[in-house]
């Protein structure tokens, strides 16, 4: 009986290897370095002045670039 269970366990492990299971580290939320690269660019910043092509001083304080003179 025990040998049958061992054979069944080995077959299951061969058919469904643990490497096929996605790990938590593969989730985008767990990779902050890549997530920060996807931040809003200045052109899409809500305070970006498209006519002047720059951000007002208040928006520059919040990280919008380039700043208007």
Swiss-Prot record:
According to its UniProt record, in which tissues is this protein expressed? Expressed by the venom duct.
Report the locations given in the UniProt record: Secreted
Compositionally biased intervals (Basic and acidic residues): 28-43
Cysteine amide, modified sites: 68
Q: Which residues, renumbered to this chain, carry the PTM 4-hydroxyproline? A: 66
What post-translational events are described? Mostly non-hydroxylated. Contains 3 disulfide bonds.
Q: List the disulfide bonds.
A: none
Task: Provide the residue ranges of the propeptide in this protein.
Answer: 21-52
Stretches for region Disordered? 22-43
This entry carries the following GO cellular component terms, namely: extracellular region
Q: Which UniProt keywords apply?
A: Amidation, Disulfide bond, Hydroxylation, Ion channel impairing toxin, Neurotoxin, Secreted, Signal, Toxin, Voltage-gated sodium channel impairing toxin
- KW Disulfide bond (keyword) present: yes
Gene Ontology MF term list:
ion channel inhibitor activity; sodium channel regulator activity; toxin activity
Pfam families to which the protein is assigned, alphabetical: Conotoxin
Indicate the secretion signal residues: 1-20
Q: Which InterPro entries match?
A: Conotoxin
Q: What is its main location?
A: secreted
* Highest taxon of source: Eukaryota
What family name appears in the similarity comment?
Answer: Belongs to the conotoxin M family.
Q: What does this protein do?
A: Mu-conotoxins block voltage-gated sodium channels (Nav).
Q: What is known of its domains?
A: The cysteine framework is III (CC-C-C-CC). Classified in the M-2 branch, since 2 residues stand between the fourth and the fifth cysteine residues.
Protein name, as recorded: Mu-conotoxin-like Am3.1
Q: Which organism is it from?
A: Conus amadis (Amadis cone)
